[in-house]
Amino acid sequence: MNFVLLALAILSFPLAFAQFGHFFQQGFPFGGGFQQQQQQQEQHAPGRQHKGWTESERVHCRAGYVCPASLACVPTPADCPCPYPEDIKCVIPDNRPRDEGEGPPFVCVRGDTGCAQVLEFSKPI
């Protein structure tokens, strides 16, 4: 009786593997399919996710800097416009020395308060 059960188990293994073998190869990380799928995703995913970074390489800018959000050509990154027309560009007060061509820090805000809230939050504690 034990011999029959053992023989039945051994003979049913190829059938089970034929039925579920693909699942074990592709469904779990140890099957090899996971690595192939991950490598395919890495090949299709660009290194730079922001649309402007890839398109800015095609823009010819003599001023020196292409803004990634708007693709505007400006002399320095601080001169970039806000990405949306309804945004307001607020300069953050900063008295530190800057490198040549480096503009003041800024943030783009939206809403009724304008730059007043930015100035309030930028005060030292």
Swiss-Prot record:
The keyword Electron transport does not apply. It comes from Cryptococcus gattii serotype B (strain WM276 / ATCC MYA-4071). Transmembrane segments: none annotated. Belongs to the LCL2 family. This is Long chronological lifespan protein 2. Residues 33-52 are annotated as: Disordered. Residues 35-46 have a biased composition (Low complexity). Residues 1-18 form the signal peptide.
